[in-house]
């Protein structure tokens, strides 16, 4: 940064994998309670989007109204409502933002000889108490707890109360076995061992975590330690942080690599990744035997799951990687030879498989051929089938309850299913009250509105019902959810376009997988028309219009006809081009 008498100059690098970037014309710097407006930039002129080059970032010098030369700290805010890029507490005195870490955590002595908890069934609540040091409500920090217990929605965050003003939040979830769960703060994932009838206390240094998530400081050794655990398994939880990138054999970046692969090429790729990661875990001297066993078990189960999922992963790779023209691979395989490596996978014949959060994935007939016989899997399979309605926010019917009594042999497995059912009922009752408050707020607000859609409305009727009221205008429909990070990133990129094309109607459609409380808070900062569907309606809409992911966009012309459809963000210029055409 340069503090000049005529302007404040801020040198920036904006990282993005692809597409276009721009700076909101309402951006400003805040220092000592005074606002300094954005003047412009040669590299990123107001209202202009710049394509991200192959290097993955755009470098620019942003000009703001002049700040006093005595300024030592400032906030960069792209929008006043915190919906854009926001960077808080930037220091100009050479010091880094710091939180006050309690002394007992800094002096914490961890037991390297900690033992893993038993894999015997033990039904109860797992409680997570989180404290964010250095937290301020205006930061709009997102916090999710992801803990799977077989009969909960797949990798979906648990609903929880808002983060308190002091940065604390507590959530409890039903649990029957110790498994690796995840705390997600903004985009940073923190794994920990969620154990039934146990409480884990987690303290997070938010300023340091935020620095560690940036390109500038990602490899800085001084920002590696930002989380402390307290509880019976604090040592294991702490050590997990050093191997958290080693326990998933198939990450998002892998989709680039596997585009166009045959099943055998894919198997070899996954196997090589597994062996490389396993070697890294085994050679990590910073972890004890318990953490090593846990990491080996989770990695091995993920490896097996990746092999079984070859068809889906290869098919989805081009879309996820954003590559066009990739020829479809022949998916036929010789099952016996293809899955032969699994015959030597020890975890499939060990109770350590129970540490795997997604053990329910191994209840299919194909996967059961390679895993030791266990009556527990039979009960999980029944519960999995009965709990499918939970994904659609529907409690069990009386008939389903009776089927559970008749078909699930293990009492604790049955009670876990029923406990999830009761939790869902409570959530729905609470959600109705929250939704009523959100609608009330929308009626009093001029920047966003809500359209009610009958939960029984068919997929064929949904889009026409929404767009018919806007005939004579072009409409951009954005299908998203609160948990979809690419969706949210795209919204930020589109914001300046919305300022330019004010005659367009912007419609945002989410479904019941978005916690209603979080959805209600987020839409306050997303100007436009908002719609909330049931999960069944969202699935039916995807089937009708033949798309399999989000974000998905529709452009509707003045006559109410869909003229453009795209899954994954196509870039600002493409949307602008399609909207201009729809306005003709």
Language-model segments: residues:
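Short, solvent-exposed, Trp/other aromatic-anchored flexible loops in extracytoplasmic proteins
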Residues: 39-73, 78-81
